Amino acid sequence: MFVDKRARSKFWLYCVITSLALCDIASAQKYVQTNLVSDVPGLAATTDPNCTAPPSKQGCAVLNAWGIAFSSTSPVWIADNGSGLSTLYTGAGGVVPLVVTVPPPKGATGHSAPTGIVFSGSAAAFQVTANGVTGNSAFIFDTEDGTISGWSPGVDLHNAILAVDNSGTGAVYKGLAIGQSSKGWFIFANNFNSGWVEIYDSNFQWVKNFTDTDLPPGYAPFGIQNINGKLYVTFALQDADKHDDVAGPGHGFLDVFDLDGNKLKRLISHGELNSPWGLALAPPNFGKFSGDLLVGNFGNGHINAFRIDDGAARGHMLRPNGGTLAIDGLWGLAFGNGAAAGPTNTLLFTAGPNDEADGLFGSLQAK
């Protein structure tokens, strides 16, 4: 059979171009994970200096590292769920010698269990008082104990101050966001037990609750993030006690609300979601997923990318060897601030590996 040489050349050229394109696509979604700080010796570049007798967890602070926040210039603040503390680091993993205690409910013994943390940019909102001194909160925490606390350095450098205590009603706060509208400053706390997102004003006074009433039974607000003035809220499946999530393929939803709690749209249903919690909008220089909404699954540790306008799936992060990037116990996601928290195209993450018994702070960069 005669085969035209020109046709054969075009065929091979097509094969080469296609192969190169596929290689380019695969490499573009590969990301390098760097473990910066952990309580587990050898897991990260730095072992938690608060650990007094490694490998035991005695004195350790970075346990089940959860929420992550910072100002435009500050280092990274992490809510350490397993120790009731907040520890500070640079974006490169340098230890900042300040440890803040997040208080438990009134009259409770033991440490608190902080989850969400936000930075407040207001000079007069969210004031707390202790020992006759009043100041605005720079960082605000919520906890699985059903409390919300504010940290004001002029009030107490080493302790956040209890501002809201709903432990008596069984509240279990899993996430926290902050936002400013024409009506003022507000915080938004995900009550996983009740299934509502609770809004509080700048005086820590309850305003109202909201949720997605179209969800299947058993789903409750899990993660939350203010992105470009809109609230992105993830929903996870509750366990029988309505305290923890039930992980599994497709177990999750993601909605978008305005700052008044009005649902704007359902962005993602099921699919690659698996107890989603971490949320971050990628900058324009983050490899294949530049400009995409990144959603971290606590359930399987995957980080999936979606178009932020319509929720179309864009794939998930891969390791340099082509395998799926999975971070055990993945929680928070946040891009650096271009200052102490690291480059703006470096994705910082927190995690509670080994069934939330340990903690990890690290970073991800496009390869």
Which residue ranges define each predicted feature?
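Sequence/structural signature of beta-propeller domains
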Residues: 28-367
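Bacterial N-terminal signal peptides
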Residues: 12-23
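N-terminal secretory signal peptides that target proteins for export/translocation
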Residues: 1-9
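Short, flexible coil/linker elements and helix-boundary hinge sites characteristic
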Residues: 3, 21, 54-57
